[in-house]
Amino acid sequence: FLPLFASLIGKLL
């Protein structure tokens, strides 16, 4: 799991 991907999910949430 990439941290950048997690950042995108955080913005969606």
Swiss-Prot record:
Entry annotated with the keyword Ligase: no
GO cellular component term of the entry, any: extracellular region
Leucine amide modification, residue list: 13
Domain of life the protein comes from: Eukaryota
Keyword entries, A-Z: Amidation, Amphibian defense peptide, Antibiotic, Antimicrobial, Secreted
Subcellular location: Secreted
Spans traversing the lipid bilayer: none
Tissue distribution: Expressed by the skin glands.
A GO BP annotation: defense response to bacterium
Primary localization: secreted
Function, in words: Antibacterial activity against Gram-positive bacterium S.aureus (MIC=140 uM).
Family: Belongs to the frog skin active peptide (FSAP) family. Temporin subfamily.
Protein name in UniProt: Temporin-1Cb
Provenance organism: Lithobates clamitans (Green frog)
Source species taxonomy: Eukaryota, Metazoa, Chordata, Craniata, Vertebrata
